[in-house]
Amino acid sequence: MEGDGDKLQSAVIVPRHIALVMDGNGRWAKIRGKERCEGHAAGVDALRVALRAAAGCGVEYLTAYTFSTENWNRPEEEVRALMGLFVTAIMNEMLDLMTNNIRLLAIGDFSRLPEDVRESLEKGIRETAGNTGLTLVLALSYSSRWEMTDVIRRLARKVRDGSVEPEDINVDLVSDHLSTAGIPDPDLFIRTGGEKRISNFLMWQMAYTELFFTDTLWPDFDADCLKAAIEEYSSRERRFGKTSEQIALRENKY
């Protein structure tokens, strides 16, 4: 992995957390006369490249939208193939994750996942728990609407049980009940494949995230593409509701 981040200029501000929608696997396969499952397999290879590049650039967290709750509505054959691919990919990538000191986490409604997928995830999370490099978060059977509904349900139970007062519910308490509790909000969102929407992904967490869209299909997204996105992110002014003058004044203090 050495050298993956060498081409970034020293002045570039690297996002701590990147959220990623890996779109375009099916179209990539169709253009080449291949089956959709072959496009998804190529997408796994692209994620491996992106992981190494992100770690080389100094990114601490990368959350990949791997399978949404809406994806359960895809043809049964494709869903079955994707589930098998998840198991194979996790098993095959374990050595690479360990070698590159990458920690694996996952978020989503795991109750809908097949048992072998859950077992593979649990094994990967357990075996990489001690790694201290980049954290890869797989969003599997995930959507923001599912997540917020789950948060509301759990907080409602706590109010009913008397452990939480309605007046105690604030932004911090909601954040503490999210699937991503303990993980910083994304600084940069990247979506490949040409679509310009976030597709029910980390909607609470991305309140102030910088959005980057590219026409590049996911299997073609390489290290140079990632670095270009980071450099674009670095050129933007993140104000978080403040004015440019307030940001400049704050920066001048340091």
Curated annotation (Swiss-Prot):
Catalyzes the condensation of isopentenyl diphosphate (IPP) with allylic pyrophosphates generating different type of terpenoids. NCBIfam families: PRK14830.1 (NF011405), uppS (TIGR00055). PANTHER family: DEHYDRODOLICHYL DIPHOSPHATE SYNTHASE 2, DEHYDRODOLICHYL DIPHOSPHATE SYNTHASE FAMILY MEMBER. This is Isoprenyl transferase. It comes from the Bacteria. It comes from Porphyromonas gingivalis (strain ATCC BAA-308 / W83). The keyword Magnesium applies. Pfam families: Prenyltransf. Substrate binds at residues 24-28, 36, 40, 68-70, 72, 74, 191, 197-199. Binds 2 magnesium ions per subunit. Homodimer. Its cofactor is Mg(2+). PROSITE patterns: UPP_SYNTHASE. It is an enzyme of class 2 (transferase). Its EC number is 2.5.1.-. One of its GO terms (biological process) is polyprenol biosynthetic process. Mg(2+) binds at D23, E210. The active site is at D23, N71. InterPro entries: UPP_synth-like, UPP_synth-like_CS, UPP_synth-like_sf. GO terms for molecular function: ditrans,polycis-polyprenyl diphosphate synthase [(2E,6E)-farnesyl diphosphate specific] activity; magnesium ion binding. The keyword Magnesium applies. HAMAP family: ISPT. Belongs to the UPP synthase family. Gene3D superfamilies: Decaprenyl diphosphate synthase-like. Keywords: Magnesium, Metal-binding, Transferase.
